[in-house]
């Protein structure tokens, strides 16, 4: 699946935008957010087996840009990538940019959450102020870059609630009694860090593309 790259036909190029993530939860949220744009949203899966980008940035924004540029070069298409994670005050901001692999390179939600609970136990707290943070970066084939950020503030507790969402959602309380994992998809998109960043990106893309 190739994308034309001539600057003269920029509008044609922009009708196809690759969502540069292999995370199904993120992909679903991003496809829904960009549904209102008259462009073709494409998954990385359409391009076969692609290597992972080396996410060695020190911030979410740096990692998002690394991924967007990497997959733009691999696919020849404009790309949108995000990097997001959890920052827990009692843990000095951890897991931060290491949220996806907090428990190691092959970590999953279960092992990452177990690691989170052990770290809270280590500092002898049952709950802590925390935030979810998302950086979203769009990179066009001509090098044009757009960037947005979203933040959702809450409390991390050592008691899980809810079956929805993914990542640390069952432990992330948006108020005293309700976690991100207990929200409907529509409710989550309204207040989540990624939902905020995506709405800002949609606005920027409307101005840029049309």
Which residue stretches match the model-derived regions?
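Anionic-ligand binding patches
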Residues: 15-18, 24-210
């Amino acid at each position: 699946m190739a994308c034309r790259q001539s600057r003269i036909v920029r509008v044609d190029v922009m009708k196809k935008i690759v969502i540069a993530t292999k995370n199904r939860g993120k992909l679903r949220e991003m496809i829904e957010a960009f549904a209102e744009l008259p462009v073709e949203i494409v998954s990385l899966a359409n391009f076969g087996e692609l290597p992972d980008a080396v996410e060695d940035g020190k911030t979410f924004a740096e990692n998002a840009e690394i991924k967007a540029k990497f997959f733009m070069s691999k696919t020849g298409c404009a790309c949108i990538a995000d990097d997001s994670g959890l920052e827990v005050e009692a843990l000095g901001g951890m897991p931060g940019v290491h949220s996806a692999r907090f428990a190691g390179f092959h970590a999953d939600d279960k092992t990452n959450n177990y690691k989170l609970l052990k770290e809270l136990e280590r500092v002898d707290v049952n709950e802590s102020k925390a935030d979810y943070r998302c950086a979203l970066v769009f990179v066009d084939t001509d090098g044009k870059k757009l960037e947005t950020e979203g933040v959702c503030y809450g409390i991390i507790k050592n008691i899980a609630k809810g079956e929805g969402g993914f990542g640390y959602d069952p432990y992330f309380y948006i108020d005293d009694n309700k976690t991100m994992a207990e929200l409907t998809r529509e409710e989550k998109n309204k207040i989540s860090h990624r939902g905020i960043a995506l709405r800002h990106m949609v606005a920027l893309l409307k101005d840029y593309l049309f």
